[in-house]
Amino acid sequence: DELEKQTGQPLEEVCIAAAGRVLKTVTTHVEYEYAQESVVTGEDVHTLDLLGIEKAQEAFKEVNDTSYKFYCVGYSTVKFFLNDEVFISLEGHKANKIGEDIIVTFLPEDVVDGLYAAVGQAGLSVANMTLEPIAAINVAIPENYRMLNIALVDVGAGTSDISITRDGSIIAYGMIPH
């Protein structure tokens, strides 16, 4: 109520950043080959992301040694590839084949459901969910500084979040419980 009064705007949706001691990540590579040379669109890049997430989910199912059901809660593209060459961005370029290295993150169903329940109890709904290490690095380290090899450690009350950059990309992230 106080935020609504201060801003003069009703709050209905929130974006949340999840922490989790049981965070699991999978890094994978995915490619898509066009029938003929094409200009890469934003939709093509989004499709590539979805293919990467799907491939990571399949890989995670094979190694998941718990009885927990996990949800994909975030992902980051490490590198894009255009005709097997590393590119910063794919959109607008002509290509026969596109690809990406992608990090996909999973949290147990009960953690995700608990976050959604807490937001619901506040009379709000979730508009977007990410992970604390992804949110922290996006706020603290602009993309042009990610060419440096940087490790960002966000020390919190329950977990410390770690994000690592190299060659312009987030190459790893995770959480360490206290």
Which stretches of residues belong to each language-model region?
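Amphipathic coiled-coil signal-relay and dimerization helices
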Residues: T25-T27, S163, G174
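Nucleotide/phosphate-binding catalytic cleft detector across ATP-hydrolyzing
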Residues: D1-V14, A18-A151, S169-I170
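A short acidic Gly-Thr/Ser loop motif
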Residues: A18-R21, L152-T159, T165-G168, I176-H178
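Residues that cap or flank secondary-structure elements
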Residues: L107, M175-I176
